[in-house]
């Protein structure tokens, strides 16, 4: 392709001010995307080529394990999502689904994911074990009403995603196929030139028994990954488990009541009373909001040197009740407290807080749901709030069971923690960008949407189901996070918009012009993905643009063209050497094969 006639470059000289991370800056500056609105981008021709190459790699790998491509609607009827009990959670409050009503007043949502639709189709088309297993996938635009779109294509309101769904006759078959997809994902990401790590993950709103995320390690990542040096364990921080450090015992001479005026934080109490945070139990209140406006107050207790993992807490509360949990909110504002609680000493709460603190006029359930992390429940002697303003209290041999406490892991694992009693490896931490996620959904959706099949013995059973996602546009931006320098992007050759760019320094020179056309046409004949920068701009402008857009190889045609010599430059390795034109094609093919084989 030629820059002047079919592939104009829209590079910018200045760094866009709205871009927070380097990959977002480079996508805008190199002309790959254009911002239309917050979280909404146009994919320019050069970006579309990257997306198409990533998509081709995905299709190749998924087709090789027996998956079939289809295309599902983006507009979903609310009735389907109500059957799965996800409509309220996805549309109310901070829900991420764009939703609307048509002319007849019927409700619809713009799809962030497709479990309901594909399960509905499976219920109509799969009726026998003889048709199983089956896996369908699509590559399509998705929509999410992000509260705060940021980081370009990392967290946008419209993005391209590959989502796949498999159906099975047994849990064993699902688990086997889940592993097969995981292996295919590793091949996909390697073929895209990415370094990734697979980690245990929370299943979130999609649900299911187990799930695994695939992360690109990068400083700009929004997720934290905890892992061991040996590679024996890796998990997203939302899912990670570990052993906390040992608490420091409390001295015997401490008073039963501590006057702690205006000491509402753990740090303030410790500094003023010669205590360690591990000797304190902090009590945090949350409000669990269930479908049907059912609200439950939560008392969550954890050791003072640890932090509550709200994802773990959400999942634990969701299992306790027969209703669908929509939202979990930490209660700290004065208005909410005054409306629902009486004589409530915020900042001085103890684990023995009475149910009578909940006002009779409150819409809340009139009993605290009490949850405590093992890091706190194992303390036989500790300091906590005295349920009186400006007072903390010494608790000895306190019976959490007598207060109906549920003991459960609600703690954030952190770097430096030990894995377990049997494994004393310490956790390390890195930032990561999630580019893929696979789930064993089990029978969650088939039960609710009545997707059944007839087994070998003739009995009707619910389908077993898996779900598999890849962020296509995220892969493109994550690749830039891992492959750039001070000059611009350094694309992995597999997903680069072109393999090579030809840069004549002076097209007014007839020798250069003729040689340029010869090389360009020869590369086209040999089916090499080539871009010709045939602009009449200064050579310096062309060089800068070529470095910015990041095509792996550059062929520079300059003064030595009179001797039938050109320069072949590797953007990836930052190497450059002169070569005669009769050896150029052969050398380029050899050098590019080395790059391809690196990630095959």
UniProtKB/Swiss-Prot annotation:
One of its GO terms (molecular function) is ATP binding. It catalyses: tRNA(Pro) + L-proline + ATP = L-prolyl-tRNA(Pro) + AMP + diphosphate. One of its GO terms (cellular component) is cytosol. GO terms for biological process: prolyl-tRNA aminoacylation. Its EC number is 6.1.1.15. Keywords: Aminoacyl-tRNA synthetase, ATP-binding, Cytoplasm, Ligase, Nucleotide-binding, Protein biosynthesis. Its main location: cytoplasm. Catalyzes the attachment of proline to tRNA(Pro) in a two-step reaction: proline is first activated by ATP to form Pro-AMP and then transferred to the acceptor end of tRNA(Pro). As ProRS can inadvertently accommodate and process non-cognate amino acids such as alanine and cysteine, to avoid such errors it has two additional distinct editing activities against alanine. One activity is designated as 'pretransfer' editing and involves the tRNA(Pro)-independent hydrolysis of activated Ala-AMP. PANTHER family: MITOCHONDRIAL RIBOSOME PROTEIN L39/PROLYL-TRNA LIGASE FAMILY MEMBER, PROLINE--TRNA LIGASE. Homodimer. HAMAP family: Pro_tRNA_synth_type1. This is Proline--tRNA ligase.
């Amino acid at each position: 392709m030629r820059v002047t006639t079919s592939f104009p470059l829209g590079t910018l000289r200045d760094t866009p001010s709205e871009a927070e991370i380097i990959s977002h800056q480079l996508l805008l500056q190199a002309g790959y995307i254009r911002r239309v609105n917050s979280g909404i981008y146009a994919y320019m021709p050069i970006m579309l080529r990257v997306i198409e190459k990533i998509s081709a790699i995905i299709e190749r790998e998924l087709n090789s394990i027996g998956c079939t491509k289809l295309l599902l609607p983006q507009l979903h009827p609310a009735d389907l999502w109500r059957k799965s009990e996800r409509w309220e959670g996805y549309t109310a409050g901070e829900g991420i689904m764009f939703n609307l009503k048509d002319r007849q007043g019927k409700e619809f949502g713009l799809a962030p994911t497709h479990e309901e639709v594909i399960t509905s189709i499976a219920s109509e088309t799969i009726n026998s074990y003889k048709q199983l297993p089956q896996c369908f996938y699509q590559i399509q635009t998705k929509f999410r009403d992000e509260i705060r779109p940021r980081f370009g294509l990392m967290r946008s309101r419209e993005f391209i995603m590959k989502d796949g769904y498999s159906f099975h006759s047994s849990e064993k078959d699902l688990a086997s196929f889940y592993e097969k997809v995981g292996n295919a994902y590793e091949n996909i990401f390697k073929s895209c030139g990415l370094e990734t790590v697979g980690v245990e993950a929370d299943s979130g709103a999609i649900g299911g028994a187990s799930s695994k995320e695939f992360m690109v390690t990068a400083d700009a990542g929004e997720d934290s990954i905890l892992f061991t040096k040996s590679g024996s364990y890796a998990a997203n921080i939302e899912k990670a488990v570990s052993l906390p450090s040992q608490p420091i015992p409390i001295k015997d001479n401490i008073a039963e009541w501590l006057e702690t005026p205006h000491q509402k934080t753990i740090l303030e109490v410790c500094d003023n009373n010669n205590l360690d945070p591990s000797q304190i139990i902090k009590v945090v209140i949350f409000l669990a909001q269930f479908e049907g406006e059912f609200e439950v107050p939560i008392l969550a207790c954890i050791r003072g040197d640890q932090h509550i993992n709200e994802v773990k807490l959400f999942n634990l509360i969701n299992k306790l009740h027969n209703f669908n949990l929509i939202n979990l909110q930490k209660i700290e504002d004065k208005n909410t407290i005054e409306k629902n609680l009486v004589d409530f000493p915020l900042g001085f709460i103890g684990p023995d807080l009475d149910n009578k603190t909940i006002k009779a006029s409150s819409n809340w359930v009139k009993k605290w749901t009490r949850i405590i992390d093992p890091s706190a429940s194992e303390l036989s002697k500790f300091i906590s709030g005295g349920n009186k303003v400006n007072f903390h209290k010494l608790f000895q041999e306190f019976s959490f069971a007598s207060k109906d406490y549920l003991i459960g892991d609600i703690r954030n694992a952190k770097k430096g923690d030990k894995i377990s009693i049997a494994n004393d490896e310490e956790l390390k931490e890195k930032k990561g960008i999630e580019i893929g996620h696979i789930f064993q959904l089990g029978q969650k959706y088939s039960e609710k949407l009545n997707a059944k099949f007839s087994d070998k013995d003739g009995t009707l059973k619910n389908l077993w189901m898996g779900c598999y996602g890849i962020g296509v546009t995220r892969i493109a931006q994550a690749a830039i996070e891992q492959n750039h320098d001070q000059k611009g992007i350094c694309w992995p050759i597999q997903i680069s918009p072109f393999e090579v760019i030809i840069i004549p320094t002076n097209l007014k020179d007839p020798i250069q012009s003729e040689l340029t056309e010869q090389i360009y046409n020869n590369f086209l004949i040999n089916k090499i993905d080539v871009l010709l920068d045939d602009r009449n701009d200064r050579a310096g402008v062309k060089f800068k643009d070529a470095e910015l857009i990041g095509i792996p190889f550059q062929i520079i045609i300059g003064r030595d063209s009179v001797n039938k010599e050109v320069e072949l430059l590797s953007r990836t390795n930052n190497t450059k050497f002169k070569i005669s034109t009769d050896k150029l094609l052969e050398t380029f093919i050899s050098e590019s094969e080395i790059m391809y084989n690196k990630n095959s």
